[in-house]
Amino acid sequence: MGRGLHVAVVGATGAVGQQMLKTLEDRNFEMDTLTLLSSKRSAGTKVTFKGQELTVQEASPESFEGVNIALFSAGGSVSQALAPEAVKRGAIVIDNTSAFRMDENTPLVVPEVNEADLHEHNGIIANPNCSTIQMVAALEPIRKAYGLNKVIVSTYQAVSGAGNEAVKELYSQTQAILNKEEIEPEIMPVKGDKKHYQIAFNAIPQIDKFQDNGYTFEEMKMINETKKIMHMPDLQVAATCVRLPIQTGHSESVYIEIDRDDATVEDIKNLLKEAPGVTLQDDPSQQLYPMPADAVGKNDVFVGRIRKDLDRANGFHLWVVSDNLLKGAAWNSVQIAESLKKLNLV
């Protein structure tokens, strides 16, 4: 089945929602009806899709009557309230928030890694955290060939991961500082938290709120989601997540330990050359390596700077970059929808 699909996009006016619409159009995703939904505040907004002007409607339980696939990206509270209502009315929900990711009955899917988990869905499929998606997509081919027992990651994440308001704050702060004007941070690192810091010309080692164990919620998302997606509950994972003053594109320095001592850098490169959804950019002699500015607007995960650890024969270092609004959100969601069609699950 594929014809006659009715697709709804919830959060259609947000950064990720806009990218979802662009991705659906770019992929020529086959459907008969597209419904755009948002909060009451954004209802009435006009959006163009494939040359046709559509009006965004206020999301309600009744909005999902007749919907086959609902792509959610309007915040966790909206997903918690409306995703079950969509499922009750027969829709399959692909949710881009953290609301259901660690629910044991909800598959958490990166199609290049665990597409088969889609068979186990009960109406809701969770899209992982942006920084998790790009990392596991890069690590899965290595894990399949050589095993994996440890992952240590430091992330360098773009401001767009915190939403449109954060991007506007980056722009306004940058302009103010260049003009030697005073700034009053209001959003970063966490809107509504006790303190706010300058993001322009700065690096903030906090993404989301701190937990009792000293890790941030973002770091714990990476740790727990990686184990779930890879079906490796005993995998050792540690993460440090940092916000940088760039608009789009997350970068990650990843250290891994595999189960064998005999793998070479060339072995790892050859695996990644053939990996779906991965582009290898790694030639130190030509200063070729991934950078976020080059990844913007592209669906792939880019990997480079692959080195064998100098002390541990089973250790490797990688640099992983991706567009956080595409593979980290919109493209992975649409990929899941495409997989549902391919597997005849919708």
UniProtKB/Swiss-Prot annotation:
Q: Gene for this protein?
A: asd
Q: Name one GO molecular function term.
A: NAD binding
Its pathway?
Amino-acid biosynthesis; L-lysine biosynthesis via DAP pathway; (S)-tetrahydrodipicolinate from L-aspartate: step 2/4; Amino-acid biosynthesis; L-methionine biosynthesis via de novo pathway; L-homoserine from L-aspartate: step 2/3; Amino-acid biosynthesis; L-threonine biosynthesis; L-threonine from L-aspartate: step 2/5
Detail which positions bind NADP(+).
Answer: T13, G14, A15, V16, R41, S42, S160, G161, N324
Subunit details: Homodimer.
What EC number(s) are associated with this protein in UniProt?
A: 1.2.1.11
- The chain residues annotated with the modification Phosphoserine are S98
Instruction: Please give the name of this protein.
Output: Aspartate-semialdehyde dehydrogenase
Oxidoreductase is among the record's keywords: yes
The lineage's top-level taxon is Bacteria
